[in-house]
Amino acid sequence: MPYINNFLVGPIGLGLKSLTWTENPVPDEEAFRIMNYALSHGCSFWDAGEFYGLSEPLANLQLLSRYFQKFPDSIDKVFLSVKGAFDPETHRVHGTRECITKSIKTVRETLKKVKTIDLYQCAAIDPDTPIEETMACLKEFVDSGDIRCIGLCEPSVEEIKRAHSVVRIAAIEVHYSMLFREIEYNGVKKLCHDLSIPLVAHSPLAHGLLTGRVTTMADIENLKKHHQCNEQPPSSTFSSTLPCIQALKELASKYDMSLAELALSFILSAGRGRILPIPSATSYDLIEASLGSFSKVLDTYQFAEVVSCLEKTLPPPASPNSEPQVTGGCSSMC
C-alpha cells in the first residue's frame, strides 16, 4: 500500500466526483453511507474537487463539510485530495498566484476549516503559466500550513521533471485503466517509479465501460446527458473497445471475478503498491462491488493473461513514445 506524504492510504481510494457532478446529486444519507463504508474498508484517500457540481460548483466540498461535521471522528482518518484552480464557466485551469490563492481560500472556507487540505493540485497543467511559478506558489501554502502537500494532474514527463525541480511532488493523478494505458507508453509511469512518486489512477473503471453497466450506445449517451463533462467515453471508443471488453468479461468469469473487480485488480497488480485506483460510486451497491477486489488480486499468470488479452484486442496509442513498461502480478496484497 502506498504512502502519500507519510500517510498510509489504502490500496484503493474513493473518487467523490460522481456524488455531486450530476443533475441529481446523491442524497446525503446515501452519500454518507458510501463514504463510511469505503473508509471502514480501508479507502482513506478521498479525491474531491472545488468545481465538482453542475448547478452549484462547490457542491462536492459542501457535501464533505456536512459529512465531517456529522462524523468528526473521520477527519483524521481521511487523506483529502482536492483539485482546484479551475473555472467551470470557461473550462480553463489557471495556475497563477492570484487564482491559486483564491482557490485555496475558497476550499478552506467551504470546508469551514474543519478538515485540512491534505493534498492540493490544480485540475490540470496551465499551459499559459510556467509550472515553476505554480509550484513555487503552492510551496508557500505548504509552508504556511494551508495545505499539506502538492500533487500534479495529468502532467507530461517534462512537466513532472520541471515541477519536481522546484518542490517535492507527493502524488500524480493520471487517467489509467485496462482500456487506457497511455502512461505505460509515454514514460510517465517509469519516471514516477524512478522518482518514488505514487500514481493516483482516476477513471479506473473507464467511465462505466469496465463495470458491465455500459453495454449499448444508448448507455453512452445517457452518461453524457446526466454527467455534463467531456470525460465520458465517446461512442467511437465504445465500439472500438467492445471486442476487448467482451474478452475481459470472459477472463473475469474464469477468475471468479466481476469485470469491475478485474479492472481494479489489474491496476493493483500493475502498480505493485505504487498505483492507487480511485473508483467512484453513486450507490452503496456499486462501492461494495468495487471493493471486492481487495481480496481478489491477480497472480502472475493471470496478470500476464490479461496483458496478452489487451495486446491482442486493443490497439496501443497511435504514437507511443516508448515501449510499454508493464510489470506486475502478485499473489498477495501489495
UniProtKB/Swiss-Prot annotation:
Broad enzyme group: oxidoreductase
Keyword Signal carried by entry: no
GO MF annotation terms: aldo-keto reductase (NADPH) activity
SUPFAM superfamilies on file: NAD(P)-linked oxidoreductase
Alphabetic keyword roster: Cytoplasm, Nucleus, Oxidoreductase
Xref: Pfam families: Aldo_ket_red (PF00248)
Entry GO CC: cytoplasm; cytosol; nucleus
Transmembrane feature ranges: none
Record-linked CDD domains: AKR_AKR8A1-2
Region span, Disordered: 314-334
Alphabetical list of InterPro entries matching this protein: Aldo-Keto_reductase (IPR050791), NADP_OxRdtase_dom (IPR023210), NADP_OxRdtase_dom_sf (IPR036812)
EC number from the UniProt entry: 1.-.-.-
Keyword DNA-binding: no
Catalytic residues as annotated in Swiss-Prot or TrEMBL: 52 (proton donor)
Homology family: Belongs to the aldo/keto reductase family.
Name of the protein: Uncharacterized oxidoreductase C3A11.11c
